[in-house]
Amino acid sequence: MTRTERTILGIDPGLANTGWGIVEQCGSRLACTAYGCVSTAKDLPLAQRLRKIHEQMAAVIARFEPACVGIETVWFGVNVQSAFATGQARGAALVACAERDLEVLEFSPSQIKLAVVGAGSADKEQVQYMVRQLLALEAVPSPDHAADALAAAICYTTHEGFARRTGAACAAYDVPDRGILACGASAGKDRL
């Protein structure tokens, strides 16, 4: 029996559909424990939709007890309205994470694609294929939002070590954290 080193929650936020995925990491091995999607009806008032996202994400966190979270940032494309709605859903999910004091790393869509596929411009099918391969799944996770959430969790495993090393380097060289890097060193944060 292998010991789980840590449990990672990946989140792909969206007002209509917020995908989530649980990845267990033991050394360099990754395994998918569960995934799903919180869907909200378009005819519900906005506040009710956000409450549903928050409550269901809080339930996922309570059930699987992740140690950390990888979440996709909002991408401002052509549709600004959609970006605002996604940002609100993202906020509801982040509050659920904050209630449990979970470490959260945020990734752009291109960072996630680069970590999972090796190319920041990869298409959705390439990401889904690699999620399936990296997690040794029999099929591509469905819906798409769940596959994207699993990709965010996988991305966390590749970036988390870098963020910690960068934080140590910031502290060692007395470099202030300007919000660009996840420097956890108090030396940098005190000077902002």
Give each language-model segment a name:
Residues 1-192:
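Phosphate- and other anionic-substrate recognition elements at nucleic-acid/protein interfaces
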